[in-house]
Amino acid sequence: MKYFAIILLLIAQSCQKPIKTENASSYIFTWVKDENDWNSDYIAVINSNPNDRGYGSLVSTLPVGYSDINAHHSEHRFHEIKELFVNGFSGGRSFIVDLNEPENPKLKKTFTNIREYTFPHSFERLPSGNVLATFQTVGQGNNEVGGLVEISPDGDFVRSSNASDPQVAEFIRPYSLAILPEIDRVISTSADMKQKDLSNVVQVWRLSDLSLIKTM
């Protein structure tokens, strides 16, 4: 109920005229699902500068043009290029949002599969500025395990590595990830969003070549 209350508050605020802030230096960017799936999911920009007269107010919104896609994960941190990858998992669709002007956010690109990899889930920005993403599956349906896919800031394929591991019998569906560049590692977790089966593994990868080292 609390989740829906927050969404309802944001929806109510979105009906008001956006407020132009003065001397604002910080914002909260939220990726919001429409409660009833009637209207588009959207990015909401909120003024989080406690010294500004508009503190806590809705600055702007950006509908992405799709409803019933289950606004889900975004990048874990906001990168200096001020763009954000966000995911609508149920629709298998992701979006790149340009937030260089918080009062006027722009939809840069939308994408679904990247080559054979489908149903993107989580995103983590690499030191290079590229994004490393988990994709739950390969192909349509929920039959083949996905993997890690590196994507350029423009949403183009860079490289990939499959998460299947012939050394283990466990059901694998890549879920979230953490990047550890100082030790050349990536850690990914596993959970099946479509709930076909339990998926309780952790995988360790080499960041430099995306090779799978160990499934536990």
Question: Where does each model-flagged region fall?
Answer:
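Asp-box/WD-like beta-propeller blade repeats and closely related beta-sheet repeat scaffolds
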Residues: 99-182, 190-192
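Blade-loop segments of beta-propeller domains
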Residues: 55-125
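Short, solvent-exposed loop/turn segments at conserved positions within beta-propeller repeat blades
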Residues: 36-39, 89-92, 140-145, 193-200
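Residue-level detector of Asp-centered blade-edge/turn motifs that repeat once per structural unit
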Residues: 22-24, 78-81, 125-128, 180-183
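Beta-rich catalytic cores
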Residues: 24, 39, 70-73, 119, ...
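Short loop/turn segments immediately following beta-strands, especially the blade-tip
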Residues: 45-54, 96-105, 152-157, 204-213
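C-terminal motif of bacterial Sec signal peptides marking the signal peptidase cleavage site
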Residues: 11-14
